[in-house]
Amino acid sequence: DEEKVQKKLDEINIEFNQSSSGVSAKTHFTREDRSWWSSLFNSSGNVNMEINYTIKAPEKHSVDIENDYGGIYIDRLLGNAKISCDYGKIDIGELHGNSNQLNFDYTRNSHIGYVKNAEINADYSGYEIEEAERLNISADYTDSRIKKVAQLDFNCDYGSINIEKAKKIVGNGDYLSTKIGRVFESLDLNLDYGSATIDKILKGVSKVEINTDYAG
């Protein structure tokens, strides 16, 4: 009823701060006990809530975003992005900044169109990157798919990594399913258990080194 709805609204506080360095917004829940938090997202509860932020800012600015149990959507950014997302989804058009940090756990069907340079830490997730200049990936129990990348370093355990086109790859994995389409410059893999499939190593590749233990 209306009284219960108003009570829940009164227990949510959105804090905005502005300074010369930027603008920040935080959502505070005055009651964070387990039963109250569950009622926000449980359809069997009396009240369901959804809190959305829409931010309009010049694309040259940098962003620092943390969100749990929800999605993060970015169109195009020239500045750097620091993003943390758990139990949600990331959908990004373009990240042109020189230093981007993406941390996410328990996310599915996340997508990035283009990223210039990024460090990715992911657990129990699935994501796709269409094009990247440089990627450093650390992922466990995660399905990673990269369509095109210039330079890739990865350290992944369990899950899978699928790379369609790459200039340079340095990779380490345990219990990882590794699929690589075409390599144009160099390939250095260290894999234990799991599997590895490479479709084509182009003429002129300067280095190919593959070390495996119990990998097919």
What does each model-identified segment do?
Residues 169, 176-216:
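A beta-strand-loop signature enriched in Asp, Gly, Thr, and Trp
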Residues 1-67, 73-85, 89-122, 126-138, ...:
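Acidic (Asp/Glu) and glycine-rich low-complexity loops/linkers
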